[in-house]
């Protein structure tokens, strides 16, 4: 589908070209500065220089010559100095945008820019045998939003949960389970037991060298594929995945694959050989395999004792993804503190000859802090675990729902509270630049009057409520004369609804879900202004009421789509 704003730009280029004054290859349409009262502009400096004419004179001549056809989305054409300004035709825009939203439905906002290409997104990636905490939630939520955004851009998207299921720590975990017994619980309680077993064994190991030897034996047995060690390790992995899945289900997270680090173990010797053969790495004096590339600090891909590290497995992971999926992009959603690691990783895989035509992207993010700005940390004893965070969010939302909507059935109130509570957590992560640290501020997160998920969800529910009231009064959605929607607040809302496809493109280009969050917030705000200034059910005429009901329906549908891109539910009632 070619959306209204795309057609508007095409109309502008065609209108300028039709004058015969400017070659097509010199026509570049841009968005004007905020102080210019227009929707798009053609800055004539470049064209005037090539043509050898005065820029202001060229703009004035074009403004006087352009004659848009009757079905064009071009309204007014004016010249201000060297700027040729174009405004949208309000009535035609209203009809075009609202018809597009109705026709496209849940697909409104999607484009085909990425058709035929594949994107791999690496996100969440918790460690096995540990509870998921708020430190995991940022990668999980940002990554899932990027999955939605790139699918909306037309890409085939592979969401991969790169589990931390390998490493020397598993020797301690297996030894601890053999010594003290396996956890008897499920879910987060089981993960807490495993953490306690690990901590207990680690503490006792400091005073008992035999325990350290035992952990080393289990680690070696696991690496060598010992059946007993592998069986115990797999039991631990399965237990951890079941616990994590409970959180993923509540957050609406869906992965295409969950390949852990262990999956790539067999590839590591070949990767090290390739790194040496390509001279991307070299053997140090102590026998370790190291790399020193692009003026980055030296780093290891194989220890002197023959052991491998995260970097080795990450190189193997890229090689596998290139062979298996042939992606145009591989995107890593990982803590900003890992920026150097990814610069080194991308440098060595390119030096090895991999991914020469592939975009390798690290999407970094900041930490979650307490209201007084302190980072949450296990060592500081202020860590918040994910399941407890979600439970707390839903409980707080339930109290608000019960207070405001006591007339709704209990089951519906519970569903609304889950949607609002989980939505608050997701939006709090996505509404600003991911590099910034975020704070858990429940009053702001659950407010229905500010920049919060609850406010956006309430705006959607208000739209649906208006449509239900219309139906109760016997006024059904019907064909309407959309050219009646000329009030300034109607036009601002329509223009903003038309921007969703542009917002999707911008969010993808910047790897920035906050662009969609900002679009949703502005939609809700503009709808609020429209609702205050333009009576819907009590409009001056039945024809205007029908047109405004169509605008309400379009707003609800578009806002639902925007929220879905963020992974947030849009309740019908609140």
From Swiss-Prot:
Catalytic activity as recorded in UniProt: tRNA(Arg) + L-arginine + ATP = L-arginyl-tRNA(Arg) + AMP + diphosphate
Location(s) in or outside the cell: Cytoplasm
Taxonomic superkingdom: Bacteria
Gene Ontology cellular component annotations, sorted alphabetically: cytoplasm
Motif, 'HIGH' region: chain positions: 126-136
Molecular function in Gene Ontology: arginine-tRNA ligase activity; ATP binding
Alphabetized UniProt keyword annotations: Aminoacyl-tRNA synthetase, ATP-binding, Cytoplasm, Ligase, Nucleotide-binding, Protein biosynthesis
Main location: cytoplasm
Assigned EC number: 6.1.1.19
GO biological process: arginyl-tRNA aminoacylation
SMART domains on file: Arg_tRNA_synt_N, DALR_1
Stated family: Belongs to the class-I aminoacyl-tRNA synthetase family.
PANTHER family: ARGININE--TRNA LIGASE, CYTOPLASMIC, ARGINYL-TRNA SYNTHETASE
Subunit structure: Monomer.
Protein's recorded name: Arginine--tRNA ligase
Lineage per the UniProt record: Bacteria, Bacillati, Chloroflexota, Chloroflexia, Chloroflexales
């Amino acid at each position: 589908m070619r959306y209204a704003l795309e057609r508007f730009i095409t109309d502008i280029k065609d209108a300028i070209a039709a004058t015969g004054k400017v070659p097509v290859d010199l026509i570049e349409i841009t968005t004007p500065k905020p102080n210019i009262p227009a929707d798009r502009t053609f800055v004539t400096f470049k064209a005037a220089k090539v043509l050898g004419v005065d820029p202001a004179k060229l703009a004035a001549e074009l403004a006087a010559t352009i004659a848009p056809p009757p079905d064009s989305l071009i309204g007014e054409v004016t010249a201000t100095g060297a700027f040729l300004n174009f405004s949208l035709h309000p009535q035609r825009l209203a009809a075009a945008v609202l018809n597009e939203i109705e026709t496209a439905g849940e697909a409104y906002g999607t484009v085909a820019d990425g058709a035929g290409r594949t994107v791999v997104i690496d996100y969440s990636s918790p460690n096995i045998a540990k509870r998921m905490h708020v430190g995991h939630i940022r990668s999980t939520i940002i990554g899932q939003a990027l999955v939605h955004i790139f699918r909306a851009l037309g890409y085939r998207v592979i969401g991969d949960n790169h589990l931390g299921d390998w490493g020397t720590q598993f020797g301690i975990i297996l030894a601890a389970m053999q010594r003290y017994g396996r956890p008897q619980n499920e879910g987060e309680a089981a993960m807490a037991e495993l953490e306690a077993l690990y901590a207990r064994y680690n503490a006792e190991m400091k005073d008992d060298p035999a325990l350290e030897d035992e952990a080393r034996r289990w680690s070696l047995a696991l690496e060598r594929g010992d059946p007993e060690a592998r069986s115990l390790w797999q039991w631990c992995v399965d237990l951890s995945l079941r616990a994590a899945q409970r959180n993923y289900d509540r957050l609406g997270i869906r992965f295409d694959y969950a390949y852990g680090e262990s999956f790539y173990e067999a590839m590591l010797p070949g990767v090290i050989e390739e790194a040496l053969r390509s001279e991307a790495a070299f053997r140090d004096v102590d026998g370790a395999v190291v790399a020193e590339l692009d003026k980055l600090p030296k780093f290891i891909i194989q220890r002197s004792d023959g052991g491998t590290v995260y970097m080795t497995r990450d190189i193997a992971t890229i090689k596998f993804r290139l062979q298996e999926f042939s992606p145009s992009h591989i995107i890593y959603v990982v803590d900003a503190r890992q920026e150097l690691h990814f610069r080194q990783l991308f440098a060595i895989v390119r030096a090895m000859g991999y991914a020469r035509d592939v975009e390798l992207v690290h999407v970094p993010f900041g930490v979650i802090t307490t209201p007084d700005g302190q980072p949450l940390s296990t060592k500081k004893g202020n860590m918040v675990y994910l399941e407890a965070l979600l439970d707390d969010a839903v409980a707080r939302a339930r109290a608000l729902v019960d207070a405001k909507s006591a007339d709704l059935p209990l089951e519906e109130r519970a569903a609304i509270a889950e949607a609002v509570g989980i939505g608050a957590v997701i939006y709090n992560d996505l509404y600003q630049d991911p590099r910034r640290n975020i704070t858990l501020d429940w009053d702001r997160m659950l407010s229905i009057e500010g920049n919060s998920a609850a406010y956006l969800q309430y705006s959607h529910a208000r739209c649906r409520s208006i449509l239900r009231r219309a139906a109760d009064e016997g006024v059904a959605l019907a064909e309407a004369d959309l050219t009646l929607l000329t009030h300034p607040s109607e036009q601002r809302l329509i223009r903003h609804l038309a921007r969703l496809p542009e917002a999707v493109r911008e969010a993808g280009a910047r790897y920035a879900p906050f662009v969609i969050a900002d679009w949703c917030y502005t939609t809700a705000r503009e709808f609020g202004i429209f609702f205050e200034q333009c009576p819907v059910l009590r409009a001056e005429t039945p024809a205007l009421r029908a047109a405004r009901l169509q605008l309400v329906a379009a707003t609800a549908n578009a806002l639902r789509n925007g929220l879905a891109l963020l992974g947030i539910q849009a309740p019908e009632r609140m």
